[in-house]
Amino acid sequence: MFHRFSKSILFAPLLSLLLGGIFLVSCGDDDDNEDVQSYSSKQKDGQNKDYTVNGVTFKMIYVKSGTFIMGATSEQTGAYSDELPAHSVTLGNYYIGETEVTQELWTAVMGSNPSRFSGNMQCPVEMVSWNDCQTFISKLNELTRATFRLPTEAQWEFAARGGNNSQGYIYSGSNTIDDVAWYASNSSSTTHPVKMKAPNELGIYDMSGNVWEWCSDWWGGYTSSAQTDPTGPNTGSRRVFRGGSWYSIATHSRITIRDNCAPSISGKNAGLRLAQ
């Protein structure tokens, strides 16, 4: 099922054997806390929110509730079987990160930068496993007294599609991939600073390309039945990631592309985006 990734990612032979061809490349103080909380709490629900952690500011984009068709819809030519069947999903209001978590924000929270491509702190953090992301989010919540988490797969796709403002694009924000994504043909084999490409309909950046983004869900197949606020299977051995990366070909950067990996594995093309 995952040959599309083993063909597009250089992979250590032994690790590739062990993982069955999965894509990954061996894959403040109290006063500061008060400042963070007062800064964000001045903003009302239904508006975008800004947070500052140890001098690093990041934005959460408000996504209004809506119903959409999740999975490979008609514009998603070349879709794989795991993108089907397309099905109706209804979501409540939520927030999602304007950008992927940067190396700057990760370092402000964790005190270190695990990234392979560490030349620019505005690049997305990578070399972080799903488990690493949970540790980061727990510490971020302690600092901000907020409730950050990873997005569900459904929340990720609705936001990537542009929410209720969706224009039905193939990639997140455009049918022309070079306008919105860093991918195999234009990345020069590295990540790039966030917000260098055009945003999508909600003002969200890099949901196609740059780095794959972990979601909260266990991996599982789709169902044809309508769902409300789905969170994926109750148990599993692999977690979902979405969006493609700097190493992905164009068809692997589409909005509906999906794959999975063990939660303990990290890669130089995998990072995260926050949700609330």
Label every model-predicted segment.
Residues 76-89, 164-165, 187-190, 211-276:
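Surface-exposed recognition segments
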Residues 180:
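Alpha-helical phosphate/pyrophosphate-handling elements in metalloenzyme active cores
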Residues 20-51:
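Bacterial Sec-dependent N-terminal signal peptides
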Residues 116-122, 171-173, 224:
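Feature responds to low-complexity, polar/acidic, surface-exposed segments characteristic
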Residues 1-25:
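Sec-dependent bacterial lipoprotein signal peptides
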Residues 55-57, 79-164, 185-205, 276:
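Short aromatic-cysteine micro-motif
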Residues 57-69:
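Mature N-terminal segment immediately following signal peptide/propeptide cleavage
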Residues 51, 205-208:
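Hydrophobic alpha-helical segments, especially N-terminal targeting/anchoring helices
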